[in-house]
Design a protein with these regions (language model features):
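Short hydrophobic/aromatic-enriched beta-strand-loop microsegments
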Residues: 14-15, 82, 107
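Conserved GTP-binding G-domain of TRAFAC-class P-loop NTPases and closely related GTPase folds
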Residues: 4-11, 90-148
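Acidic side chains
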Residues: 18, 58-59, 99-100
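Flexible, glycine- and charge-enriched loops at secondary-structure boundaries
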Residues: 28, 32-39, 61, 106, ...
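Short, glycine/charged-enriched secondary-structure capping and boundary segments
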Residues: 2-5, 29-30, 70-74, 99-102
């Protein structure tokens, strides 16, 4: 997504919570050991990007309303910025196949993905009310047939 926007001349910053985390740890066993620092850096990068780029993509799996509310309370929304939530409804089997294509630290154990899928709470427009979001869009099929 970031690549296709950039190809159209739109300045894009893609902020991945996992990439930030992996830059701060040396071993997978430390995955959540620096969560406070990861979250702080994630919020800092998000707000800096909202102020300087045409498009900021916040890449993180916020599976619960509570985890989404935690980040929403920290969004510093400049007046001229349109905030949009993209909810990508990727089926579990597609997530598993995509994950199987990953290597090293990026690959997530299947049991973790299955646990997250069971705990997932669908986002609603109501939960974003009051945070300055313009809309919540649901993308039913955010991948191309035969791609995965």
């Amino acid at each position: 997504m970031a690549g296709s926007l950039a190809a159209r001349g739109i300045t894009v910053e893609h902020i991945s919570r996992d990439e930030l985390r992996f830059s701060m740890i040396s071993d997978e066993s430390e995955y959540f050991s620096k969560e406070k620092e990861v979250f702080s850096k994630f919020v800092e990068k998000m707000n800096n990007s909202l102020n300087k780029n045409d498009c900021t993509i916040i890449d993180a799996t916020h599976i619960s309303k509570a985890s989404r509310a935690k980040i929403l309370r920290r969004v510093e929304n400049p007046d001229n910025v349109r905030l949009l939530v993209l909810y990508l409804t990727t089926p579990l089997d597609v997530c598993m196949r995509q994950n199987d294509l990953r290597t090293g630290r990026e690959r997530v154990p299947h049991e973790v993905i299955e646990k997250m899928a069971k705990q997932f709470e669908d986002p609603t427009e109501k939960e974003f009310t009051g945070f300055g979001f313009d809309s919540v869009e649901v993308w039913e099929k955010p991948w191309k047939e035969g791609e995965i």
